[in-house]
């Protein structure tokens, strides 16, 4: 398996890498992914597994209450790295996706901050909520 790794500025290499997999698909052009998308690969998923598992814990009302009371304690109990904790503190959902966190799990974490799916989408597209809702196929969304 060959990997084409590119670096951009001070960002970690894993944030910009495109991993070429030993499979062929007419639907996926691994050499030219769509701008702003990140191909979910085994290594990327493994890297984000701990943080995805942490987000999954937010299905429990007890975890949500404990996080609301003391987020640092809950993050420490789950053994998150300093970098993973910083992603959570900053609510940096795009970096979480690049890191390998499952997008559906990110919604569970965002909800703990009182951020709904549409607000999360707006944040990930770097748009205001109002701008984002205008792009949705919902009549009279705002």
Model-found features: residue ranges?
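Charged, low-complexity intrinsically disordered segments
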Residues: 2-142
């Amino acid at each position: 398996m060959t990997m084409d790794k590119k670096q951009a500025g001070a960002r970690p290499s894993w944030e910009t890498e495109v991993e070429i997999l030993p499979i062929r698909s007419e639907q996926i052009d691994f050499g030219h992914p769509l701008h702003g998308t990140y191909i979910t690969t085994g290594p990327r998923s493994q890297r984000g597994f701990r943080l995805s598992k942490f987000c999954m814990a937010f299905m429990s009302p007890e975890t949500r209450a404990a996080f609301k009371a003391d987020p640092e304690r809950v993050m420490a109990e789950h053994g998150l790295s300093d970098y993973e904790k910083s992603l959570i503190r900053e609510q940096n959902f795009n970096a979480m996706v690049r890191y390998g966190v499952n997008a559906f799990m990110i919604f569970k974490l965002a909800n703990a901050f009182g951020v709904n799916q549409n607000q999360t989408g707006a944040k990930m597209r770097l748009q205001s909520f109002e701008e984002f809702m205008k792009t949705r196929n919902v009549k009279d969304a705002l």
